[in-house]
Amino acid sequence: MFNYGNIQLKVCGITDQKSLEVIQKYSVSRVGLVSDYLYGPNTLSTKEIQELTIASYNLKLNPILLIGNIQMQEVISIVNDVAIKEVCISNQYKNEEIELLNNKTDAKISISVNYENFDYNFFEEILNNISSFYYDLIIYIKDTIEKKSLVE
């Protein structure tokens, strides 16, 4: 339906099966399921993520778990329990923790970055442990949402 060239779009903040079905009609294959450990709207419990992960795979969609603000051992446990194939972690973990996630799960790992936590040296260090970077124009802080444009 749409031709995005080499850009892979991801629709984030999915909270129900009906949204998955609509997304599938628009030829977008990547969907973001946001853990309630993160700040912001449209977050899901681990049980809800597990249910939507199964529904996503049934619809031939690629769900991505967005997670952070918890210890890496708990991230590993959730990734394995949910049986998700890709996880996007917040940019708070050290390279050793990312290596642990890489070694203890079968999931591809991506990392969320934004204009406030852009550290080129860190990105060079973790490059062998992740599959992609996601650049976020919205920063969720406990009770605040800060938005930027690409121009900014």
Where are these regions (language model features)?
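N-terminal beta1-alpha1 ligand-phosphate binding loop
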Residues: V11-Q17, Y26
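Short helix-capping segments at alpha-helix termini
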Residues: Y4, Y57-K60, T105
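Non-catalytic positions within long, well-ordered alpha-helices that form the structural scaffold/packing
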Residues: Q24-S27, V79-N80
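Alpha-helical segments flanking ligand/cofactor-binding loops in enzyme cores
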Residues: E21, I54, I76-S77
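N-terminal amphipathic alpha-helix/helix-capping segment at the start of soluble metabolic enzymes
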Residues: M1-C12
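Short, structured active-site "lid" loops
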Residues: E51-P63
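Glycine-rich, positively charged N-terminal anion/phosphate-binding segment
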Residues: T43-T53
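Catalytic beta/alpha-barrel core
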Residues: K10-C12, G32-T43, N62-Q71, V75-N102, ...
